[in-house]
Amino acid sequence: MFLNKYISNYSRTRAVSCAPVLSYKKCSYRNFNGLLQARFQSNNLSWSNRNRVVYKSFQPNPRDKRFQWIFGALIAGGGVYYFTHLEYVPISNRRRFNDVSLDFEKRMAQDAYKEVMSEYGDRMLPSYHPTTLYVSRVLKRIIAVSGMSDLKWELHVIRDPTPNAFVLPGGKVFVFEGILPMCKGEDGLAAVLAHETAHQVARHSAEKIAFTRAVSCIVFLAAASLDLSGQLSHFLLNFGLLLPFSRKMETEADYIGLMLMSQACFDPNAAKTLWERMDAAEGQMGKALAFASTHPSSKKRIRKIEEWLPEAQVKRETSDCYHETWPMLQSFKEVHW
């Protein structure tokens, strides 16, 4: 990364236009830890020798030209690769870059599933437990409208007071008992499950892998060319790119989840009241700097949900929830468990 050598001969020194003199000082440079240091050496040239100096710094360097061709080819190839891996996110219709295959995502999810089971396996409620049946009843309605009923969904309710829930790629759903009191009923639980299901619908896990790989390469090249320290480039990568990207995905999952729960005939207003309770429960713990968080603040989420509520209400009304409840319930049989 650093160039640690002296440029001591005149042919590799940048030429400076000046009036004819019998003696001059030339500069040789050394790049050391990002600082440009110069030392001056006195050299006496006769007037007759002045015209013999060849300013090679003004002559084209074949190596530089070859580097430009290689760099240009990489940029062009990267552009083609980027545009050929663009796709649209379901429901939100956001266009994004994603080069992670379903098989790779599946392998990653299997490893994550093993880790979760090894940590919480002894605290899983049985499938016939009333709490598991309650969560399953709500989740089935969300899955029925998600467009992903063909997955082999698995629900695990964990006996743990932590208010948490998540879905792994492939339909592995984990719900902690601690989230249930905060939901205050099926509509609130639907808001949680729809949000987590939305991450699966949008394939956010795969997109995050693709985004991280791409921006890591860009930051590495920028750090090398600008001579940035490792800590600074790491700071820029995380706080300037990865964390804002994570908050963007969470916001998108809020939107997709709100549409899903509305289409499944749950009350979308429950999503707003859920985050109001979350905001109150966070207290001082929720006062952390926004730029250092992977999730938007509860207040920001509430404001966005308020913007989307009219659309969500229309989605619910067009789903004809009051006349087609039983046909939709019958469709649950088609979901694979």
Curated annotation (Swiss-Prot):
PANTHER family per the UniProt record, alphabetical: METALLOENDOPEPTIDASE OMA1, METALLOENDOPEPTIDASE OMA1, MITOCHONDRIAL
Classification of source organism: Eukaryota, Fungi, Dikarya, Ascomycota, Taphrinomycotina
GO CC term, one of those recorded: mitochondrial inner membrane
Primary localization class, coarse: mitochondrion
Regulation: Protease activity is induced in response to various mitochondrial stress.
Active site (UniProt): 196
GO biological process terms held by the UniProt record: mitochondrial protein processing; protein quality control for misfolded or incompletely synthesized proteins
Cofactor note: Binds 1 zinc ion per subunit.
Disulfide linkage: 265-321
Enzyme class, broadest EC rank: hydrolase
Signal peptide interval: none
Transmembrane feature ranges: 69-89
Chain ranges on the Mitochondrial intermembrane side, renumbered to this chain: 90-337
Mitochondrial matrix-side segments: 1-68
Binding site for Zn(2+): 195, 199, 250
Family: Belongs to the peptidase M48 family.
InterPro entries noted in UniProt: Mito/Outer_Membr_Metalloprot, Peptidase_M48
A single GO molecular function term of this UniProt record: metalloendopeptidase activity
Subcellular locations according to the entry: Mitochondrion inner membrane
Membrane-topology annotation of the record: Single-pass membrane protein
Pfam families listed in its UniProt record: Peptidase_M48
Enzyme Commission number, as recorded: 3.4.24.-
Cited function: Protease that is part of the quality control system in the inner membrane of mitochondria. Cleaves and thereby promotes the turnover of mistranslated or misfolded membrane protein.
Record's keyword annotation contains Disulfide bond: yes
Name of this protein: Mitochondrial metalloendopeptidase OMA1
